[in-house]
C-alpha cells in the first residue's frame, strides 16, 4: 500500500469536443434564417478561434450559438476568452476568441495558497501548468478536491482532477 496519495489539478479541454462543437455551430449558422446570408466563417487555430461575420448583431448571435452548443457538449465556457471585436475589410467584423488551456503561474500560486491555508495535512507543488496535491490519506485529498471545486468560480478557469493515486 502506498504511504502517500496524490492527484493533479489541471485546466484543459477536449479538443475533439471543441471541433465537434464548431461543426455544430457552422451547421446551425447555415440553417438559421437570420444568419444564412451573413457569410460567417469560424476558423480554429492552435490557441484561438477567429469568427468573421457581417455585423455586430450577427457576431452576437454566433457567440450565443457557440455558448449554447459548447454547454450541450460539456465544454466549460471558461475556456473561451472573448477579445474585443475589430473591423475587417469589406464591412465585416472579426473577433478573436483565445482558448484557455493550462494553469498560469499566477492562478497556480493562488490555488496553492488557497489549499495550503485551508488544509494543513496536504502538500501542494506547482509543476508547470498543473498543481500536484499530495497527502497521507485519501480523505485529505477528498477534502482538497471539495475545497478546489468550491473555489473554482474565483479562479475563472475550468479545473479537472487527474492522476488520482
UniProtKB/Swiss-Prot annotation:
Tagged with keyword Repressor: no
InterPro entries, A to Z: DUF520, UPF0234-like_C, UPF0234_N, YajQ-like_sf
SUPFAM superfamilies per the UniProt record, alphabetical: YajQ-like
Cellular component GO terms, alphabetical: cytosol
Pfam families with a match to the protein in the record: DUF520
UniProt feature coiled coil, ranges: none
Keyword annotations of the record: Nucleotide-binding
GO molecular function (one): nucleotide binding
Nucleotide-binding among keywords: yes
Role description: Nucleotide-binding protein.
NCBIfam families per UniProt: PRK05412.1
Family named by the database record: Belongs to the YajQ family.
Record-linked HAMAP family: YajQ
Name used for this protein in its record: Nucleotide-binding protein Syncc9605_0652
Species this chain originates from: Synechococcus sp. (strain CC9605)
Amino acid at each position: 500500500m502506498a504511504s502517500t496519495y496524490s492527484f493533479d489539478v489541471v485546466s484543459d479541454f477536449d479538443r475533439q469536443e471543441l471541433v465537434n462543437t464548431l461543426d455544430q455551430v457552422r451547421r446551425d449558422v447555415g440553417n438559421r434564417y437570420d444568419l444564412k446570408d451573413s457569410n460567417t466563417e469560424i476558423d480554429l487555430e492552435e490557441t484561438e478561434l477567429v469568427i468573421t461575420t457581417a455585423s455586430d448583431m450577427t457576431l452576437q448571435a454566433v457567440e450565443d450559438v457557440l455558448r449554447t452548443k459548447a454547454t450541450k457538449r460539456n465544454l466549460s465556457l471558461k475556456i473561451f476568452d472573448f477579445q474585443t471585436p475589430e473591423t475587417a475589410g469589406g464591412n465585416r467584423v472579426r473577433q478573436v476568441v483565445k482558448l484557455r488551456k493550462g494553469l498560469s503561474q499566477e492562478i497556480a500560486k493562488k490555488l496553492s495558497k488557497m489549499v495550503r491555508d485551508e488544509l494543513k495535512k496536504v502538500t501542494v507543488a506547482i509543476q508547470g501548468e498543473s498543481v500536484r496535491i499530495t497527502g497521507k490519506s485519501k480523505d485529505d485529498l477528498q477534502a482538497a478536491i471539495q475545497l478546489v471545486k468550491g473555489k473554482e468560480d474565483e479562479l475563472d478557469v475550468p479545473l479537472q482532477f487527474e492522476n488520482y493515486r
